[in-house]
Amino acid sequence: MARAMSFDRIVVVDWSAHSTPKVGADSIWLAVDDRRSLVVENPATRADASHRLTSIVEAAVDSTTLIGVDFSLGYPIGTARALGCTGRPWHAVWTLLADSIVDDERNRNNRFEVAAASNASIGDGPGPFWGCPPSRRVEHCLSSTKPERTAGHPPEWRHVESVLRRNGRRPFSSWQLLGAGAVGSQSLLGIPVLERLRRRFPQRVDVWPFTTGLGLPPLRPGQVVVAEIWPTLVTGTDTTGPVRDARQVADVATWLRGLDRGGELRGLFEPDVAAARRSAVIDEEGWVLGVSGVDGPARNMTVR
């Protein structure tokens, strides 16, 4: 039976692209809020984090779960076509990445090789993906520094990122793979984890807004909704914790739970995206939870 908007469990994920196991600062952090308690976890590898997410979904057959991830779930309009993908653009790219990325139990991965191959599919010369250690450069395909953009490249920014930039925010492009704050590598390594989750639980896992549209129907028992978040949007109250990433996932989970209790969470899933942009957002680019389509970030973004 469908139910009104209310999540029994809220999971917030800060992903990492480290190529070796790591805990502490700049590693993977999960905050899990089940209404009774908020637990923060620090898995050392993406494999460990993937197993944890799978176990959460497996156990939630009679409850509802929101999973917020801090990496881009889509790419700028035209990316799927430029890569030669067919079908719904967002899922064609997810399938390509899930079938191409190799990421082992110790975090060793081939993300730079996949980025280079993607660049080669899109056109001659490096780009649109860029940013890698000098030892991982691929001549004419992947450069350490930002290359000049060409007419054949998809746009640098998704619409949601353009909105954020117009409102004084500084998101990173999905194409940048390396550098402080860059999220491109996290997307390359995170999307395959989510695609495997979808394949394992095809009737239960939705990805907002790709499978839901810009909104959410009443929730079903066992339903899992994955959404993109940007922790920088949320102002926390605790600045004393030793690890910033741990504080941020806890703050975002607390913020979302507060909105859920107050009946305000549904509004985050219904941004006022212009009609001309909605198709691209739903079919390929995705959106960030809490960002308005017109006025930028939602106004009340403080943990309470």
Predicted regions and their residues:
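RNase H-like (RuvC/DEDD) metal-dependent nuclease/polynucleotide-processing core
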Residues: 2-9, 15-66, 71-304
